[in-house]
Amino acid sequence: MLTLQPQSLDWALAHAMRYGDTDVFPVPFEYDAIRHDWDEVRQYLVQQNVIDWVVRPHRALLSPKAKYGFRVITQLDPLDFLVFTALVYEIAADIEIQRVPAASEIVLSYRVRTEPTGQFFDPAIGYRRYLEKCREVLDAEAGFTHVAIADIADFYPRIYHHRLDNALRAATQKASHVKAIMGLLSRWNGTETFGIPVGNAPSRVLAEITISDIDEALLARGIRFIRFNDDFRIFATSHSAGYRSLAVLADLLYR
């Protein structure tokens, strides 16, 4: 059995109210209703065994991406989102410790730094800093003449649950939290054993721990790279060296 801490649910609601439940759509009006009756709603939620939480229907909607592309955004039922967010919040510090250290400025996506306001990630580390750091590497580190650019196609929708489960169990000793999270994903996905909700903060934390072993493997092979989410920039001393590094990345992802 696993129950959520009241303060974790408080934080999850603060996150939803300030940052929304997706990075695309307006905050649903239901969160205002939940906040209005929060004492009673929270009391109900803290009594639930979230390992057996029964999910509600969710929305999967297309959102424009770049000029001609689209991506599917998942908008969860508000109570499901609060439970999911609180669960990930309670293990987020363990996950962050397991990742390549933020101070190295190698992985510049979604570094966990929670605040009582509902903030999940360090606002100073993001895509802008990622682009700046790429330029700094080329300017300051001698020998690099080529940059190989790669991204993972359909990253979130193709994350295998078995891989995520293993990554979470390696990152935290809170096995019941892992079981509850994997149970939510399984119920949302039905018969499919891959994919996590796209467009929300807790999913980003899960995605980062899933790919963390790829970061470590590239570093162990002496490959100089910087990553933001599913975007890699690999620095090389020649075209052939860059291609070899791309082949290593492809092989690691395939495995």
State each model region's role.
Residues 1-64:
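Non-catalytic, polymerase-adjacent accessory regions of viral genome-replication enzymes
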Residues 54-59, 98-100, 176-180:
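Short, flexible active-site-proximal loops enriched in glycine and acidic residues
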Residues 90, 94, 171, 252:
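Phosphate/oxyanion-binding loops and surfaces in catalytic or ligand/nucleic-acid-binding neighborhoods
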Residues 84, 88-147:
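Active-site-proximal segment of RNA-dependent polymerases
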Residues 49, 57-61, 70-76, 131-140, ...:
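Catalytic micro-motifs at enzyme active sites that drive phosphoryl/nucleotidyl and oxygen chemistry
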Residues 121-229, 233-251:
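Conserved polymerase palm-domain catalytic core
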Residues 23-27, 56-85, 102-122, 187-208:
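Short, conserved non-catalytic motifs in the polymerase core
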